[in-house]
Amino acid sequence: MTDLAIHLDQVHKRFGNVHALRGADLKVPRGTIFALIGPNGAGKTTLFGLCCGFLGPDRGRVEILGGAPDPVRLKGRLGALPQDALLGRDISVREHLVFLGRLQGMDPPTAEREATRVLGLVDLADLADRRAGALSHGQVKRVGVAQAFLGAPDLILLDEPTAGLDPRHAHDLRALIRAQRGQQTIVVSSHNLQELEAICDEAAFMEKGVTIESGAVATLTAQDAEFFVQLAPGPEPLELLRSRVVTTAVTWEPERRTLRVRFQPTPGRVAEDVIAEVLRELRASGARVCALGKGRSLEQRYLEQATPSVPATSSVSEP
């Protein structure tokens, strides 16, 4: 059995004159929580359609759970939340989920139990008998998430899963996704990069139909090779650190009074060792530390790689 839940190799897909995918490559390891990041029009929705078997590639290879993305082969093994999930307005939420369970091959009692289970996952058990047409937008989104988890599939694709949710239910959904690590493979497409950084193991950046970078979130954000220290007003210790601590680079951002330290980790000198050295020198110089963090945000890393469009305002708390 392959270790990859998703493997795309030089995949192309056109819709008339629109070249949605231009040789996209993607490897998603089994059991990971994986972030798919990119602007509108990057090809993320098309990629999801290929993974589900709703679309076929014009060129290249698509392999899902060790084989071709055939909807019959993937029945019960792949669940998906489209960005705009639609429900039958005149049937109850329970009836909708039981119907989908029956389509997966469940017998009626099993489908009933699964509907009850997944509604509990998204805190909608008390609305099981309400007509879908009477639900709020956020409740419809949560039913869509429940639908994706129906039958405990091996692979789940979630397109903007927390969009439209109130803060408590968004928090609960993030916790639900994190809890599946190692049990199911979940791919999350979202514009909320701070959220993706908090829940995902690996990520891929897409732009104009290609994957421009991918890897472990800790590697992309340089968690093991970079850190920042924000200082209270006082002398700038830049030259002191450059002369006393062995690093690859030390830069000073005066407007935010932030030192950014980059280094090459070795088995005998890891991030925590370099952080301790820098803090020792800062303390000896009388500098006062306000904040400390490892790496840079996923948003910063993405913006470094992406083609500039309009000026972006960071929403993360890192200085």
What are these regions (language model features)?
Residues M1-H12, P308-P319:
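ABC-family P-loop ATPase nucleotide-binding domain
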Residues P69, H191, G215, P233, ...:
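Short beta->alpha linker loops
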